[in-house]
């Protein structure tokens, strides 16, 4: 894609020709080398940030809690974090605001499933009653999705035992019989296809489409740097639009930042990219996590947004 075209099509902000003459700015950012968190990596590798006069210094984090702690502590300006973690932070009055889209889920390309052993006799939500299920983070989106699927399909989610486990350990634990099921994410899902089977596409219980991750800024930083924040958000919206149309190019970048084998990337279910901060793609996650008391209270998705990001 030609960068000139990128610059002149930024929705909501006039990016060119102002960007070409805008004062350069450095942004301290936190994310993770995982596809649903990869929008900033895409923008960096494509030169979109540079073209917008932004030096975005991305630090990699392995967990949502640690990256949000760094944001709240002032060592980061912006982060990419999952909607559940951002919602929890909002409910705890951490001063942050959502400014740009992140990675999304689409039922047409399920990137997270509830997996069981190849030899398992589990066949329904009711069969899962009383069983042990592993998730990568307790009391978050994955757990809420399994509980909602069980409750809406004849089972009783209150009987399930959830444990926290790193995704790479899930398939071996399923095969060894240490757990009954696990929320298996890409790229592990593709890598372990021969060792497990899918019980259900559990994220469909949340919605057919929704945001998994979003980009947020620290409120003090946003107040001091509104113009920089607008430029950053404009780049990410356009990067999401670019990513939605260029799966081969994003796959190449994904291989570079994650070391996932190209053959696996070609077979993987891929992250969906939605360029606009649509509250309807965020509210289902808030509602599900609040329903299971993972949040202090339910609230409107718009309450997460930076004032200048609200429609």
Question: Residue spans of the language-model regions?
Answer:
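N-terminal export signals
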Residues: 4-22
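Short, glycine-/small- and polar/acidic-enriched structural segments
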Residues: 22-153, 164, 180, 186, ...
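Pocket-lining segment of extracytoplasmic ligand-binding domains
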Residues: 84-85, 163, 168-253
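Short, solvent-exposed loop/beta-turn-alpha elements that line the ligand-binding surface or hinge
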Residues: 105-107, 204-207, 274-281, 301
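Short helix-loop capping/hinge motifs at secondary-structure junctions, enriched
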Residues: 119-126, 156, 220-229
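Secondary-structure end/capping motifs
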Residues: 223-294
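Conserved C-terminal helix/tail region of periplasmic/extracytoplasmic solute-binding proteins
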Residues: 290-311
């Amino acid at each position: 894609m030609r960068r000139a075209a990128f610059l002149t099509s930024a929705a909501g902000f006039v990016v060119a020709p102002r960007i070409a003459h805008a004062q350069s700015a450095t942004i301290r950012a936190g994310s993770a080398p995982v596809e649903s968190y990869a929008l900033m990596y895409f923008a960096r590798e494509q030169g979109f940030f540079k073209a917008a006069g932004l030096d975005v210094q991305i630090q990699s984090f392995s967990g949502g809690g640690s990256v949000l702690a760094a944001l709240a502590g002032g060592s980061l300006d912006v982060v990419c974090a999952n909607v559940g973690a951002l919602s929890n932070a909002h409910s705890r009055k951490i001063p942050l605001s959502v400014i740009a889209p992140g990675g999304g889920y689409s039922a047409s390309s399920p990137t997270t499933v509830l997996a069981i052993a190849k030899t398992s006799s589990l066949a329904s939500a009711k069969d899962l009653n009383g069983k042990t299920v592993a998730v990568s983070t307790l009391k978050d989106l994955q757990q809420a999705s399994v509980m909602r699927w069980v409750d809406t399909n004849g089972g009783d989610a209150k009987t399930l035992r959830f444990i926290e486990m790193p995704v790479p350990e899930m398939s071996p634990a399923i095969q060894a019989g240490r757990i009954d099921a696990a929320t298996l994410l890409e790229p592990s899902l593709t890598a372990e296809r021969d060792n497990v089977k899918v019980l259900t596409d559990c994220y469909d219980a949340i919605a057919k489409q929704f945001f998994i991750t979003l980009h947020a800024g620290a409120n003090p930083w946003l107040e001091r740097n509104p113009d920089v924040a607008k430029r950053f958000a404009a780049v990410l919206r356009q990067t999401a639009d670019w990513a939605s149309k260029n799966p081969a190019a994003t796959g190449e970048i994904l291989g570079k930042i994650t070391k996932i084998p190209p053959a696996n990337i070609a077979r993987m279910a891929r992250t969906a990219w939605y360029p606009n901060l649509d509250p309807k793609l965020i509210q289902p996650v808030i509602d599900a996590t609040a329903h299971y008391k993972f949040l202090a209270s339910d609230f409107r998705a718009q309450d997460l947004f930076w004032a200048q990001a609200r429609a």
